[in-house]
């Protein structure tokens, strides 16, 4: 039974090349659809892809056609009703339009829905976080992390079975068999010609013929004894580890969980930080994340407790800033780490504590931070904390603050804060 082996590089995804070309061509429309999808689905839902809809008008291809008006003769196939000179009535079309339009239904009008297709989880996250980066990331020279990446470096005679190069091994086998048997094959050919000459000679020379046959048999046995492949022939792909220097960074996530933060505000803060957490883990391999929750007291927690703990209390923002400063001094020396922070709050704070927050940021944190982002989640007028932070924004280039009013503002604000700087 014949067997067909599919050696095409795309494997099961036979149309992968066409898909990639389509996504490159309509990248802007796809990115807009992905940005809209952020607000429709849970940010934590990253195990699945996303259905992307592109308006049909955006994917129309250019075409050549006759302009409107004018007189022209044309032969239409299948015409059995009209003759030259007849006037054709305009079709009665309804207002069928694209997708979910407000037009009336019509049996004759033709509408066109949006083009909808699904992108994978990786494609969704790639588009979501494209053009985003940690601002002001510097290559610190002290205790720089060194990543090792493997690169192909020829072949070697020993290695793991998974790294064996079949083609190169067979080439070595052919070369060895040719070298070991070429002389014997040449001698065998000469003896066979000699045997044929003796057999056709008169009178017969039986002793000489038997001697030649014995030599030929021994030569054939020697040629057949050459193994098809030997351990000497095996060649393995060789990989070398080359150092690739990279910067190490730590991101502090500070979130207010005081009693003034209602559940809707906490949900917005959680969504922002989940988005940030996914971005950091997907974009950078060497980024540590420190989670700090605070009310009247601040506490370093793990990821699960940061997002799902029900603990609450009053509001003293400076407690979180003090704890961050202590952690930086204890674990993240400024000369070795690029330090980033993102703080989320509803703006409520003990009035006497807001100047203290400004003082801590001015004297201790901002001089050591590459970037500090503050988001205030509120629809109300801003209070003392916002006004104190406005003074910081005027004095420090590495400090940014934004206001989030609703879920729809999360992704646009996130992109503004972490937009990749172009050279």
From Swiss-Prot:
Biological source species: Vibrio vulnificus (strain YJ016)
HAMAP family for the chain: UPF0229
Stretch list, region Disordered: 81-111
Domain of life assignment: Bacteria
InterPro entries according to UniProt: UPF0229
Record's protein name: UPF0229 protein VV2350
Composition bias type Gly residues, residue spans: 93-102
Similarity field: Belongs to the UPF0229 family.
Membrane-spanning parts: none
Pfam families, per the entry: DUF444 (PF04285)
PANTHER family according to UniProt: UPF0229 PROTEIN YEAH (PTHR30510:SF2)
């Amino acid at each position: 039974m014949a067997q067909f082996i599919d050696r095409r590089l795309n494997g099961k995804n036979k149309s992968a090349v066409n898909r990639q070309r389509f996504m490159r061509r309509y990248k802007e429309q796809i990115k807009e659809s992905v940005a809209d999808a952020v607000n429709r689905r849970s940010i934590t839902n990253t195990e699945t892809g996303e259905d992307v809809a592109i308006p049909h008008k955006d994917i129309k291809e250019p075409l050549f056609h006759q302009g409107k008006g004018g007189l022209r003769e044309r032969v239409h196939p299948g015409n059995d009703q009209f003759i030259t000179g007849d006037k054709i009535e305009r079709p009665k079309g309804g207002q069928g339009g694209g997708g979910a339009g407000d037009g009336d239904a019509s049996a004759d009008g033709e509408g066109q829905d949006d083009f909808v297709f699904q992108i994978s989880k990786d494609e969704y996250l790639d588009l979501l976080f494209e053009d985003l980066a940690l601002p002001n990331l510097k290559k610190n020279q002290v205790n720089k992390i060194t990543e090792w990446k493997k690169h192909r470096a020829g072949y070697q005679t020993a290695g793991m079975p998974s790294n064996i190069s079949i083609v190169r091994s067979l080439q070595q086998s052919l070369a060895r068999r040719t070298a070991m048997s070429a002389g014997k094959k040449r001698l065998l050919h000469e003896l066979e010609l000699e045997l044929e000459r003796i057999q056709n000679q008169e009178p017969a020379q039986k002793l000489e013929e038997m001697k030649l046959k014995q030599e030929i048999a021994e030569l054939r046995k020697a040629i057949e004894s050459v193994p098809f492949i030997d351990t000497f022939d095996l060649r393995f792909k060789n990989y070398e580890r080359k150092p690739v220097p990279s910067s190490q960074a730590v991101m502090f996530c500070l979130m207010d969980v005081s009693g003034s933060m209602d559940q809707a505000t906490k949900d917005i803060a959680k969504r922002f930080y989940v988005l940030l957490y996914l971005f950091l883990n997907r974009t950078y391999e060497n980024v540590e994340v420190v989670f700090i929750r605070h009310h009247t007291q601040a506490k370093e927690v793990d990821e699960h407790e940061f997002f799902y703990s029900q603990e609450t209390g009053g509001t003293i923002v400076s407690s979180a800033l003090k704890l961050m400063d202590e952690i930086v001094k204890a674990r993240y020396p400024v000369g070795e780490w690029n330090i980033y922070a993102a703080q989320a709050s509803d703006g409520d704070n003990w009035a006497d504590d807001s100047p203290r927050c400004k003082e801590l940021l001015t004297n201790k944190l901002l001089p050591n931070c590459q970037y500090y982002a503050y988001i205030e989640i509120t629809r109300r007028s801003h209070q003392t904390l916002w006004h104190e932070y406005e003074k910081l924004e005027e004095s420090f280039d590495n400090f940014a603050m934004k206001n989030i009013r609703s879920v729809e503002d999360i992704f646009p604000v996130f992109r503004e804060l972490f937009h990749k700087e172009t050279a």
